[in-house]
Swiss-Prot record:
Its main location: cytoplasm. Keywords: Cytoplasm, Hydrolase, Protease, Ubl conjugation pathway. The active site is at H30, C108. InterPro entries: PPPDE_dom, PPPDE_sf. One of its GO terms (molecular function) is K63-linked deubiquitinase activity. Its EC number is 3.4.19.12, 3.1.2.22. Has deubiquitinating activity towards 'Lys-48'- and 'Lys-63'-linked polyubiquitin chains. Deubiquitinates 'Lys-48'-linked polyubiquitination of RPS7 leading to its stabilization. Exhibits palmitoyl protein thioesterase (S-depalmitoylation) activity towards synthetic substrates 4-methylumbelliferyl-6-S-palmitoyl-beta-D-glucopyranoside and S-depalmitoylation probe 5 (DPP-5). It catalyses: Thiol-dependent hydrolysis of ester, thioester, amide, peptide and isopeptide bonds formed by the C-terminal Gly of ubiquitin (a 76-residue protein attached to proteins as an intracellular targeting signal); S-hexadecanoyl-L-cysteinyl-[protein] + H2O = L-cysteinyl-[protein] + hexadecanoate + H(+). This is Deubiquitinase DESI2. It is an enzyme of class 3 (hydrolase). Belongs to the DeSI family. It comes from Mus musculus.
Length: 194
């Protein structure tokens, strides 16, 4: 074991989602665990490998434009060495695969809490994952949210459908434009003998 290192929970406001959920008194937050000057977090993707990633601590811009840093919460300290933490994160990656992500049942806050419990024996504050907690108590709440928020597969399906629709619209517009050009060319290119 090594020197005591602070274990910090970095919390980010997901304000695009909060526009919908704040009306029912629930905030939606992303979180990551900072230790040794590195921040580990979990997110979804449609593939069966680890969804754990690393960002610069507190840097919301690395998460995307819809995230805003909210606060840092000191959870405790750990004696694990940095190499040990890398191994722990790698092991957690077997459980926290990208395609296992679910907003209510296995999200970034569940990961942060699991890592925090290993590193310093403490869960994250309950208010950070309140939406998931309420969803387990009030199952219909999940049905009120857009399905593409819940899993990466649903999001990918939604995005794929939107892209397909846009592609079809572009093809239709191009075909209409080509037909209009051909019709205009046919009218202006007509010569009559007198």
């Amino acid at each position: 074991m090594g020197a005591n290192q602070l274990v910090v929970l970095n919390v980010y406001d997901m304000y695009w989602m909060n526009e919908y959920t704040s009306s029912i008194g629930i905030g939606v937050f992303h979180s990551g665990i900072e230790v040794y000057g590195r921040e580990f977090a979990y997110g979804g993707h449609p593939y069966p490998f680890s969804g754990i990633f690393e960002i610069s601590p507190g840097n919301a811009s690395e998460l995307g434009e819809t995230f805003k840093f909210k606060e840092a919460v000191v959870l405790g300290s750990t004696d694990f060495l940095e190499d040990d933490i890398e191994k722990i994160v790698e092991e957690l990656g077997k459980e926290y695969k990208g395609n296992a992500y679910h907003l209510m049942h296995k999200n970034c806050n569940h990961f942060s809490s699991a890592l925090s419990e290993i590193l310093c024996g403490k869960e994250i504050p309950r208010w950070i994952n309140r939406l998931a907690y309420f969803s387990s108590c009030i199952p219909f709440l999940q049905s009120c949210l857009p399905k593409e928020w819940l899993t990466p597969a649903a999001l990918q399906s939604s995005v794929s459908q939107e892209l397909q629709d846009e592609l079809e619209e572009a093809e239709d517009a191009a075909a209409s434009s080509a037909m209009a050009s051909a019709a205009a060319g046919a009218r202006t290119g007509r010569h009559t003998k007198l």
